[in-house]
């Protein structure tokens, strides 16, 4: 890398951050900078109209299990009182040992998590080593904080980061979950699960009843999808399994072997099992 290389911010300092590199060369391409005049465009002084001009996505759940962690999300996106999308993907693999789920303004959230994935790849190429899980969590925290101007205008992004910590002493506790608030504050979940989005209250209530430490991957995936089903039952912005159209939640599992998207066939089998169990329980109570 030469002294005149654009990858250097100043002599002796290489830009291992892709975001900072972009900010130095083309700041107008960064998400928050493109929404500086949103209030004037929407005629809103406080961003109240922003929720109606852009699709919003919810709900995301994350569950740790023995030897790993998973993250799952529903597929619905809403725009005001309209259903903007039935099959939006809200869960993304960001590198070999991490994944992120997004809630909030759909377009900005997808852009943020994709930029985050580029950040991780760029850092590894420049530095020769991948970021630690704590480094990834801090990096995402800063990116959420950088979105604050847009968030104050109603275009908030709230991600959840999960990953397998290769440096963990106990492999059974290597699965980690970090949630964020709208200003970038990070909070690591120590109790094995979390949920974000408009249906998070209902999903967390479900997880609280179903979760137990030391569960295996199969059980964790079942309760994650069951919590999304419970959220969709009470939150109109959360989509449940659509058996007619073949639309089911998406999920990523991460263990010592790396991150892997759960096959749709497996998710369909679990979702149909949940619906069948709930139907049987409902018919049983009706006949009692």
UniProtKB/Swiss-Prot annotation:
Pfam family, one: Proteasome
EC numbers on record: 3.4.25.1
Subcellular location: Cytoplasm
Gene3D superfamilies noted in UniProt: Glutamine Phosphoribosylpyrophosphate, subunit 1, domain 1
InterPro entries linked: Ntn_hydrolases_N, Proteasome_sua/b, Proteasome_suB-type, PSB_actinobac
Major localization class: cytoplasm
Regulation of its function: The formation of the proteasomal ATPase ARC-20S proteasome complex, likely via the docking of the C-termini of ARC into the intersubunit pockets in the alpha-rings, may trigger opening of the gate for substrate entry. Interconversion between the open-gate and close-gate conformations leads to a dynamic regulation of the 20S proteasome proteolysis activity.
GO molecular function annotation: threonine-type endopeptidase activity
GO CC terms in record: cytoplasm; proteasome core complex, beta-subunit complex
Keyword Ribosomal protein carried by entry: no
Function in brief: Component of the proteasome core, a large protease complex with broad specificity involved in protein degradation.
UniProt xrefs under PANTHER family: ATP-DEPENDENT PROTEASE SUBUNIT HSLV, METALLOPROTEASE TLDD
Protein name: Proteasome subunit beta
Species this chain originates from: Nocardia farcinica (strain IFM 10152)
Gene name linked to the record: prcB
